[in-house]
Each structure stands twice: as structure tokens, then as C-alpha cells.
């Protein structure tokens, strides 16, 4: 029954003009090593109305430069209001490439906490629902559907959480998890239990 219901919700969401939009907010601090692959992963969501907001939280490495170069970003003027307190923005970027039309990059002063970076992303979010993740996380391609599904079925629900696992031993293909493997490292096993 749940599978059938999910399929019906998916069909309605894909065709309805009332589909709720979702903003994925992902802070990044010194993530230059993996930022391009991870942002590509976030952009592969199978959902009709979403945006990805990467918040460069004062990185001291090449995180911002890699984002600009790989996603054809240009600085854009943006009138925003700080609805939620955070350290000041330096610049805002959007892509000139249609394939990345739903990507926004905020370059802001480091706030010292992840919460400050998330607040910065929420200040530019255009949708009523948001997913708070890290820029080094890999989301399943239907993660937004999995989060929106319970909300559409029960309007009393105000928050949804996903299952998190450590990437120790995961097999990735095209920025998607294709196989889960249990690590042989006892420390990694305890990390999995913690999450």
C-alpha cells in the first residue's frame, strides 16, 4: 500500500502546479577537494521544483573558485533581507548554464557555526520547505520525494528526517550510492551505530 501511495503522490507532484518547492541548503567550509562532485550529486534530485543553495562560509581554500569555474557562476545583484540573523553576505552567484539553473551560491563571512551558514542560505531560499544537509553529503536521487511524501499525506507534520549512514565502504557510481557495505573497521561500525 505504501509503495502504491508513494507512486500516486509522485504522479500528482510531477503534474500539479501546487507542488511545494524545496530548497536544499548546504553549507561549505574548505570543501574544495570534493565540492564539485557533491554539488553535482545534490543537483541530480528527481523532483520538479527545487533549488540548491551552497553557502560558502568563508572558506580559505579553493572551494569558491571551483564552484565558479565548474558551474559557470557569475556574481548577481540580489536584494535580500536578513530574515534570520547571520554574518553578512559578500556576494551571491547564479549560473549562466541552463543545466545549473537551480543552483545559487552564497559567499558570506564565516559565522563560526554551521547554524549561521544555514541561516544565510535560508535568507535567500525561495521555497517554503527546506532540507538542511552538508555539502559533503550524498543524497539519494529521490530524497526530496521521501521528505515531502509524509508532509503531503499529513499536514500536521512539520519536520521530517532521513536516514544517515557513514560513507565507509559505500560504492558510488555517478554520484549515487549503488551498494551499501559494512566496514570491517570497528571504529567505522560504531560510527554507523551512532548515526
Protein language model features and the residues they cover:
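N-terminal membrane-anchoring/stem segments of glycan-assembly enzymes
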Residues: 1-18
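Short, well-formed alpha-helical segments that are part of the catalytic scaffolds
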Residues: 6-9, 31-44, 59, 65, ...
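Cell-envelope/extracellular polymer assembly enzymes that use nucleotide-activated donors
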Residues: 20-23, 51
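Short, acidic, metal-binding catalytic loop of nucleotide-sugar glycosyltransferases
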Residues: 40-49, 69-77
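A conserved acidic beta->alpha catalytic loop
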Residues: 56-76, 110
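Long helical/loop segments within the catalytic core of UDP-sugar-dependent glycosyltransferases
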Residues: 76-117, 123, 141, 146-195
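Short aromatic/hydrophobic "clamp" motif used to bind/position activated sugar donors
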Residues: 130
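The conserved acidic donor/metal-binding loop of glycosyltransferases
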Residues: 134-138
Amino acid at each position: 500500500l505504501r509503495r502504491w501511495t508513494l507512486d500516486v503522490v509522485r504522479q500528482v507532484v510531477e503534474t500539479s502546479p501546487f507542488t511545494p518547492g524545496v530548497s536544499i541548503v548546504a553549507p561549505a567550509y574548505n570543501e574544495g577537494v570534493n565540492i564539485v562532485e557533491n554539488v553535482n550529486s545534490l543537483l541530480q534530485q528527481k523532483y520538479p521544483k527545487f533549488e540548491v543553495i551552497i553557502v560558502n562560509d568563508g572558506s580559505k581554500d579553493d572551494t569558491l573558485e571551483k564552484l565558479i569555474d565548474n558551474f559557470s557562476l557569475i556574481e548577481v545583484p540580489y536584494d535580500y533581507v536578513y530574515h534570520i540573523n547571520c554574518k553578512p553576505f559578500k556576494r551571491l552567484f547564479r549560473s549562466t548554464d541552463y543545466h545549473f539553473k537551480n543552483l545559487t551560491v552564497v559567499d558570506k563571512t564565516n559565522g563560526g557555526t554551521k547554524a549561521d551558514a544555514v541561516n544565510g542560505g535560508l535568507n535567500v531560499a525561495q521555497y517554503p520547505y527546506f532540507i538542511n544537509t552538508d555539502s559533503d553529503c550524498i543524497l539519494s536521487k529521490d530524497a526530496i520525494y521521501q521528505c515531502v511524501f509524509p508532509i503531503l499525506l499529513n499536514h500536521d507534520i512539520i519536520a521530517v528526517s532521513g536516514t544517515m549512514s557513514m560513507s565507509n565502504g559505500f560504492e558510488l557510481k555517478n554520484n549515487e550510492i549503488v551498494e551499501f557495505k559494512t566496514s570491517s573497521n570497528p571504529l567505522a561500525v560504531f560510527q554507523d551505530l551512532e548515526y
